[in-house]
Amino acid sequence: MAIIINIDVMLAKRKMSVTELSERVGITMANLSILKNGKAKAIRLSTLEAICKALECQPGDILEYRSDEDTGFVKKKYEGSTEK
């Protein structure tokens, strides 16, 4: 399972730069990059709220769920490991 954060689409719609979003939300460019690139393991609700406020959007506008099949992960039933 993967939750994807699609910030780029909303940035383009709002004609806002990553730098401007970073300043408005109060997070570093590095952390914003982690969110954008799908490397984040979690996001605080307060951060999500700040992003939505800055982009004038709803959480559903930037969050997307993808199943394991969509992301290419296969779980081994008996071994408990994952392969890609």
UniProtKB/Swiss-Prot annotation:
InterPro entries: Cro/C1-type_HTH, Lambda_DNA-bd_dom_sf. The keyword Nucleotide-binding does not apply. GO terms for molecular function: DNA binding. CDD domains: HTH_XRE. Residues 18-37 bind DNA. Disulfide bonds: none annotated. It holds the Pfam family HTH_26. Keywords: DNA-binding, Transcription, Transcription regulation. It comes from the Bacteria. Residues 7-62 form the HTH cro/C1-type domain. This is Uncharacterized HTH-type transcriptional regulator YozG. The gene is yozG.
